[in-house]
Amino acid sequence: MFLYYENKFEIRPNENPKITIIPSSIADKEEILNFYAQELYFPEYFGQNWNALYDCLCDLTWLPQNQIKIIHNNVTLLNDEDQKIYLKLLDDAIISWEGESQHQLFVYFPENTKDQILEILKSPIF
């Protein structure tokens, strides 16, 4: 369940969250995996693949912040298949934290991408 914003400055930090802004220039799987590994301080065992990204987003025990906010400036420039996997992975990671108190994961996209994202999430991965 993504959150959508009109103006990213509307996203107010509270409780000292870890805020990560995904650069608009990220264009492939390797770049986005490396970005997450650096920004969220993934452990050395991070496997540089989609499953490893999901596993780390569902753990996050190494981060001192309770809230993690991932803010996108646009829908990623990944190829169609990777984009589907990435969005579904983020959605599943958010759901995995529901009802948990250890961490809260919030993922934001611009409001004008909502229809596109919902359409992507409806389509099968393979």
Question: Each PLM stretch: what is its role?
Answer:
Residues 1-46, 50-126:
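Eukaryotic endosomal/vacuolar membrane-trafficking regulators centered on PX-domain-mediated PI3P pathways
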